[in-house]
């Protein structure tokens, strides 16, 4: 039985088998979590879909892992700050409504 995509084709895209397994597992988790797919798939399983994306070159290992970590941290921090700002606005609105209610 020949598996598609073949391991030889995939190893042309990724430097090692270990890197391939890690990349495939991470991408499969992303797909299962609802991440948008980069192409139409022949496969049903997320693990095979991830391999199809790797084979097509749509998913690659980031060339600078420390830069990727920094960008992920920055995105998480921005999301946290946006959430805090939203909570602050809600608290201000509640306080204003309480104040307006006491004046009546």
Curated annotation (Swiss-Prot):
InterPro entries under this entry? DNA-dir_RNA_pol_omega, Pol_omega/Rpo6/RPB6, RPB6/omega-like_sf
MF-aspect GO terms: DNA binding; DNA-directed RNA polymerase activity
Stored Pfam families: RNA_pol_Rpb6
Its UniProt entry gives the catalysed reaction(s) as: RNA(n) + a ribonucleoside 5'-triphosphate = RNA(n+1) + diphosphate
User: Could you confirm whether the keyword Nucleotidyltransferase appears in this record?
Assistant: yes
Q: Which UniProt keywords apply?
A: DNA-directed RNA polymerase, Nucleotidyltransferase, Transcription, Transferase
EC number(s) stated in the UniProt entry for this protein: 2.7.7.6
Xref: SUPFAM superfamilies: RPB6/omega subunit-like
Domain of life, per lineage:
Bacteria
GO aspect biological process, one term: DNA-templated transcription
Q: What SMART domains does the database record attribute to this sequence?
A: RNA_pol_Rpb6
Name of the top EC class for this enzyme: transferase
Subunit structure comment from the entry: The RNAP catalytic core consists of 2 alpha, 1 beta, 1 beta' and 1 omega subunit. When a sigma factor is associated with the core the holoenzyme is formed, which can initiate transcription.
Q: What's this chain's function? A: Promotes RNA polymerase assembly. Latches the N- and C-terminal regions of the beta' subunit thereby facilitating its interaction with the beta and alpha subunits.
Family the UniProt entry places it in: Belongs to the RNA polymerase subunit omega family.
NCBIfam families in the cross-refs = rpoZ
This protein is called DNA-directed RNA polymerase subunit omega
């Amino acid at each position: 039985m020949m598996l598609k995509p073949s391991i030889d084709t995939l190893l042309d895209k990724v430097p090692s088998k270990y890197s391939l397994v890690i990349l495939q597992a991470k991408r499969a988790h992303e797909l299962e979590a609802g991440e948008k797919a980069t192409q139409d798939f022949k496969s049903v399983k997320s693990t095979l879909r991830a391999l199809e994306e790797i084979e097509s070159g749509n998913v690659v290992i980031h060339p600078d892992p420390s830069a990727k970590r920094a960008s992920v941290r920055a995105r998480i921090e921005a999301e946290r700050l946006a959430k805090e700002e939203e909570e602050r606005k809600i608290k201000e609105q509640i306080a204003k409504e309480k104040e307006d209610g006491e004046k009546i």
